[in-house]
Amino acid sequence: MAHKKAGGSSRNGRDSESKRLGVKVYGGQAINAGGIIVRQRGTRMHAGENVGMGKDHTLFALVDGHVKFATKGADKKHTVIVVPAAA
């Protein structure tokens, strides 16, 4: 016969791995074509000029230049723009 009671299992002890979302390159900073500007879930920020959007809503630069953040339209959507570097 056992002399110890069976130990109960804890219902805690699990957590999901962080997804490292957010702004990766800030306003005024230089970026190369293909560089990631924002990692996001859904379109919290929208792609403006010279910015592409991946299937997971990641915003990335289409040209070399500097990043600029703006609010556009009557509903003040947050938009990310890349101002091309002078050639």
UniProtKB/Swiss-Prot annotation:
Keywords: Ribonucleoprotein, Ribosomal protein. Residues 1-21 are annotated as: Disordered. Signal peptide: none annotated. The keyword Translocase does not apply. GO terms for cellular component: cytosolic large ribosomal subunit. GO terms for molecular function: structural constituent of ribosome. SUPFAM superfamilies: Ribosomal L27 protein-like (SSF110324). InterPro entries: Ribosomal_bL27, Ribosomal_bL27_CS. GO terms for biological process: translation. It comes from the Bacteria. Belongs to the bacterial ribosomal protein bL27 family. PANTHER family: LARGE RIBOSOMAL SUBUNIT PROTEIN BL27M (PTHR15893:SF0), RIBOSOMAL PROTEIN L27 (PTHR15893). This is Large ribosomal subunit protein bL27. It comes from Burkholderia multivorans (strain ATCC 17616 / 249).
